[in-house]
């Protein structure tokens, strides 16, 4: 990989082409923000299905256990666990149901490192869907923290680019991850593109005649 790509990837406002043979370019953070304001979006509602088996919702959705039952929710990922500007549920809140709970104490602030939860959240969602079951990923409004974790899951588990993941979800739910979260999703996109390029290079090397 060229040193030019590495230096560009450190600038969150620059577009980066990781694979020189690909037409795909990871946008800068400001360009990612523009995706949420381009074209018609969907109206805000309490909960939406954004992928088979995956629902993004808000605090109201998470608190209404009968409603979760009606949706067939078997797993709840609370991306806003904690006391301040968060949703106070926890595993005990669902103890009289068959719901499996996973909580993440994430602050909806641009400076918060939500990327530390990308892999454990994706693993929880993956395990829920492998049954197959339905999982609710929520925060207070269901627009930033929960949306960010679902976008990361789609990128890691389904090989969607950050652009394709955003476009897919925003057509089904009104989402708006904060600026810092978009930076981290952009960094994830570059990391995943680099890993795929490395794998492709290794495969091509193995296929060359000796």
Curated annotation (Swiss-Prot):
KW Hydrolase (keyword) present: yes
Key words of the record: Cytoplasm, Hydrolase, Nucleus, Protein phosphatase
Listed InterPro entries: Atypical_DUSP_subfamA, Dual-sp_phosphatase_cat-dom, Prot-tyrosine_phosphatase-like, Tyr_Pase_AS, Tyr_Pase_cat, Tyr_Pase_dom, TYR_PHOSPHATASE_DUAL_dom
Gene Ontology terms: cellular component: cytoplasm; nucleus
GO BP annotations listed: negative regulation of MAPK cascade; protein dephosphorylation
Active site: 139 (phosphocysteine intermediate)
GO MF terms, alphabetically ordered: MAP kinase phosphatase activity; protein serine/threonine phosphatase activity; protein tyrosine phosphatase activity; protein tyrosine/serine/threonine phosphatase activity
CDD domains for this protein: DUPD1
EC number: 3.1.3.16, 3.1.3.48
Substrates-to-products reaction catalysed: O-phospho-L-tyrosyl-[protein] + H2O = L-tyrosyl-[protein] + phosphate; O-phospho-L-seryl-[protein] + H2O = L-seryl-[protein] + phosphate; O-phospho-L-threonyl-[protein] + H2O = L-threonyl-[protein] + phosphate
Intracellular or extracellular location(s): Cytoplasm; Nucleus
Residues covered by the Tyrosine-protein phosphatase domain: 46-194
Annotated binding of substrate, by residue: 138-145
Chief location bin: cytoplasm
EC category: hydrolase
PROSITE patterns per the UniProt record, alphabetical: TYR_PHOSPHATASE_1, TYR_PHOSPHATASE_2, TYR_PHOSPHATASE_DUAL
Family recorded in the similarity comment: Belongs to the protein-tyrosine phosphatase family. Non-receptor class dual specificity subfamily.
UniProt xrefs under PANTHER family: AGAP008228-PA (PTHR45682), DUAL SPECIFICITY PHOSPHATASE 29 (PTHR45682:SF6)
Free-text function comment from the UniProt entry: Dual specificity phosphatase able to dephosphorylate phosphotyrosine, phosphoserine and phosphothreonine residues, with a preference for phosphotyrosine as a substrate. Dual specificity phosphatase able to dephosphorylate phosphotyrosine, phosphoserine and phosphothreonine residues within the same substrate, with a preference for phosphotyrosine as a substrate. Involved in the modulation of AMPK and MAPK1/2 signaling pathways.
Protein name, as recorded: Dual specificity phosphatase 29
Organism: Takifugu rubripes
